[in-house]
Amino acid sequence: MNLINSTKIFSSLMIASVENNTAIFSLNTDILETNLINLLVIFFLLIYQGRPFFTALLEERRKTVLDKIKKSENSYNEALEKLKEAKSKLAQAELAAKQIYEEAEAVAESIKKTGLAQLEKDIKRIEETTQASINTQQLSVITYLRQQVALLALRRVVSQLKNYLKPELHSQFIDRKILQLRKQK
C-alpha cells in the first residue's frame, strides 16, 4: 500500500509528456494539484512523531549490529586461540612422531645388530658343534679301526701260532719246559 501511495505522490509531482516518441519529464509546479501541503504535513509528522520510533529502531539495529560484530570478534579470537592450540598440538604431534620414528629406527638397528650378532653366535656354535661331532666321529672311527687292526693282528698271531704249534712242536715245547723245570730243582 505504501508503494502505491508513493507512486501516486511521485506521479503527482512529476508530469510526463511524450512528444515525438521521446519522453520528457518535468516538475509540476502547481501547488494545489500536487498536494504539496499534504506532503509537507506528512513529512513533518514523520519527522516529528516518527523520530523517536525511527531513532529507537535505528538504535536497536545499531545495537544488533554491534552485538553481531562483538560476537564475530569473539568468534574470531576463539578461532585464533583454537588455531594456536591446534598448531601447538600439531607441533607436539610432529615432535612425538619424529621421536617415535627415531626410536623405531634405533630399535630396528639394535635388533639388526643383535640379530646379526646372534646369527654369528649361532653360526659359530653350529661350526663348533659340527667340528666336535666330526672329532667324535673321527675318534670313534679310529677306535673302531684300532680294534679291527688289533683283532686282525690277534687272528694272524693265533693263525701263525697254530702253524708253529702243531702237536709235534707242542709236545717238544712241553718236554723242553719240563726238562728246564727239573734242572732248576
From Swiss-Prot:
Alphabetical list of InterPro entries matching this protein: AH/BAR_dom_sf, ATP_synth_b/b'su_bac/chlpt
Membrane topology: Single-pass membrane protein
UniProt entry keywords in alphabetical sequence: ATP synthesis, CF(0), Cyanelle, Hydrogen ion transport, Ion transport, Membrane, Plastid, Thylakoid, Transmembrane, Transmembrane helix, Transport
Main location: plastid
UniProt GO molecular function: proton transmembrane transporter activity
Gene Ontology process terms (BP): proton motive force-driven ATP synthesis
Cellular location(s): Plastid, Cyanelle thylakoid membrane
GO cellular component: cyanelle thylakoid membrane; proton-transporting ATP synthase complex
Bilayer-crossing regions: 36-58
Family: Belongs to the ATPase B chain family.
PANTHER family attached to this UniProt entry: ATP SYNTHASE SUBUNIT B, CHLOROPLASTIC
The protein's assembly and partners: F-type ATPases have 2 components, F(1) - the catalytic core - and F(0) - the membrane proton channel. F(1) has five subunits: alpha(3), beta(3), gamma(1), delta(1), epsilon(1). F(0) has four main subunits: a(1), b(1), b'(1) and c(10-14). The alpha and beta chains form an alternating ring which encloses part of the gamma chain. F(1) is attached to F(0) by a central stalk formed by the gamma and epsilon chains, while a peripheral stalk is formed by the delta, b and b' chains.
HAMAP family: ATP_synth_b_bprime
Main function: F(1)F(0) ATP synthase produces ATP from ADP in the presence of a proton or sodium gradient. F-type ATPases consist of two structural domains, F(1) containing the extramembraneous catalytic core and F(0) containing the membrane proton channel, linked together by a central stalk and a peripheral stalk. During catalysis, ATP synthesis in the catalytic domain of F(1) is coupled via a rotary mechanism of the central stalk subunits to proton translocation. Component of the F(0) channel, it forms part of the peripheral stalk, linking F(1) to F(0).
Protein known as: ATP synthase subunit b, cyanelle
Gene giving rise to this polypeptide: atpF
